[in-house]
Amino acid sequence: MAAQGYEVRVFNLIDPSQSDGYNPFSYIHSEKDVLTLIDNLIKNTTPRNASSNDPFWEKAEIALDSALMLYPVSEAPPEEQNFEMLIYMMNFAEVREEDDQYRSPLDMLFRALEEEQPNHVAVKQYKAFKQAAGKTAKSILVSAAVRLATFNIPQYARMTMVDEMDFGSLGEKKKAIFCVIPVDDSSMNYLVGMLYTQCFQALYRRADEKHNGRLPVPVRVIQDEWANVAQPESYPKILATCRSYNIGLNIIVQNIQQIKALYEKEWESIIGNCDTLLFLGGGNEPTSLEFIVKLLGKETIATRTRGQTKGRSGSSSTNFQQTGRDLMTIDEVRKLDTHKAILFIRGEDPVLDKKYNIKRHPNIKLTTDGKAKPYIHKPQGAPDYACLLYT
């Protein structure tokens, strides 16, 4: 791609030494952006099946995290606006259960800010957190620290210190961003979830502010492993509106159940907002098979039967009958030839066609499948940052 004039960026959670920098703080333009980012962080680091009968804990943690994020955004220089600084600030937080009058260094920092700017939103959020009693506040601190533990790991802290992504420029020039995530460990995938959220926000903002609501260069978002990375809270709305911004989304899932698991009430809307659906076959998941059969519709079969009676009073009769049947049965869909696929395009009849043989692509020679050497990405950032990544 680089040879074709593309600017290539990589966010690599498997090998941070081959990753460009992504700093979520670089995309914060308002208090609302902070709350959106924190909400995304909380949701992406909370187990899917976890439930809490008391929303107080989550709200209190959101108040603390947003206060810690809002402070450097408004009071610190750009080079200190990152998660490493947030962790540094959190290290000065302390709660003593037996002494309600104790003031930690972090308490004094926000007290000083309050004296200068009593209506500062960071002060308000921190005071909301401090309403918790000693033992409760300590539990909230522990929960927040555990949630942000990733940034205690030097290589991950470094890759989020500076930003080299510039998401908005995706819609203005030839540029590609690759997200590399572990197959066997999803604990870090929330970072990609944050990246998705801010990428869409940046593209929409760039389109509205500079290009009258439509990006000059089409942006295609290919979301492989879609089900393993938490999507933005407003994903169904993004899917419904992105086309007008010249953005296209490709959702890749193993089966329909993966969509239903994430969006139980909106899964049909998500599929309905996709103009094209490509079924590659395979799998025995009943919901997906039934869905494809229903989507294919029915065909009409004309039947002609003829009867004849021999003898002195012989007679004959012909009967025509039309019956309907599924275009393909569940069993036929399940046994679909592995070399074929079913394509659904809005407003058109379904198409059963052969899959393209990727080995025949003229650029296959540039991939490892075509015997080429694996691509090793060299971070494009400042030399000192690149050196830090390799220490």
Predicted regions and their residues:
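P-loop NTPase motor domains
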Residues: M1-I247, L262, G272, T323, ...
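Conserved ATP-driven motor cores of ASCE-family P-loop NTPases powering translocation/secretion/packaging/pilus
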Residues: L239-I342
